[in-house]
Swiss-Prot record:
The chain crosses the membrane at residues 25-45, 63-83, 95-115, 126-146. The keyword Transmembrane applies. It comes from Streptomyces avermitilis (strain ATCC 31267 / DSM 46492 / JCM 5070 / NBRC 14893 / NCIMB 12804 / NRRL 8165 / MA-4680). The lineage of its organism: Bacteria, Bacillati, Actinomycetota, Actinomycetes, Kitasatosporales. It is a multi-pass membrane protein. HAMAP family: FluC. GO terms for biological process: cellular detoxification of fluoride. Belongs to the fluoride channel Fluc/FEX (TC 1.A.43) family. This is Fluoride-specific ion channel FluC 2. It catalyses: fluoride(in) = fluoride(out). Keywords: Cell membrane, Ion channel, Ion transport, Membrane, Metal-binding, Sodium, Transmembrane, Transmembrane helix, Transport. GO terms for molecular function: fluoride channel activity; metal ion binding.
């Protein structure tokens, strides 16, 4: 079998054009990935600083991780109200702050590891209390913060 030569491909006398190149999906997503990475670095650094400032004793209730997650959830509640009801944010603000900064700051993976460490250290009741308290407090924080932010907005608009 022979390889066709460009001058012999297609019908004689008809110009053959190469298909137009499509922009890759990466081209449009690169700025989003970049701001998420930048925000994640900032949020993760803030969480690490909190862990250094308020270390958890071995076998003790992981208060730092608990409060980091609760505060992060409260901030996301306010943030979502602000960018949906108040301020038409740039398309990169939500991925930077919501996914990046707050995603890096809150740490549900450390939450899971803390639960396992408590169980392994012989503190299953503390682990169960931590599991339930974090879940309930985080959900309540989002709800209460979003509700409070909306109420503030209603009062300001009067």
């Amino acid at each position: 079998m022979t390889v066709p030569h460009p001058e012999s491909v297609g019908e004689p006398g008809i110009a053959v054009r190469a298909p137009a190149r499509r922009r890759s999906a990466w081209h449009g997503q690169a700025p989003v990935v970049a701001v998420v990475a930048l925000g994640g670095g900032i949020g993760g650094t803030a969480r690490y600083a909190a862990a250094l400032l308020w270390p958890t004793q071995s076998g003790g209730f992981p208060w730092t991780t608990f409060w980091v997650n609760v505060v992060g959830c409260a901030v996301i509640g306010v943030f979502m109200v602000v960018i949906t009801d108040v301020w038409p944010a740039h398309r990169l603000v939500r991925p930077f702050f919501g996914t990046g900064v707050l995603g890096g700051f809150t740490t549900f993976s450390t939450y899971a590891v803390d639960i396992q460490k408590l169980v392994d250290a012989g503190h299953p009741r503390t682990a169960l209390a931590y599991l339930a308290a974090t879940l309930l407090a985080a959900l309540a924080a989002v709800r209460l913060a979003a509700t409070a932010a909306r109420r503030v907005l209603v009062r300001r608009r009067r």
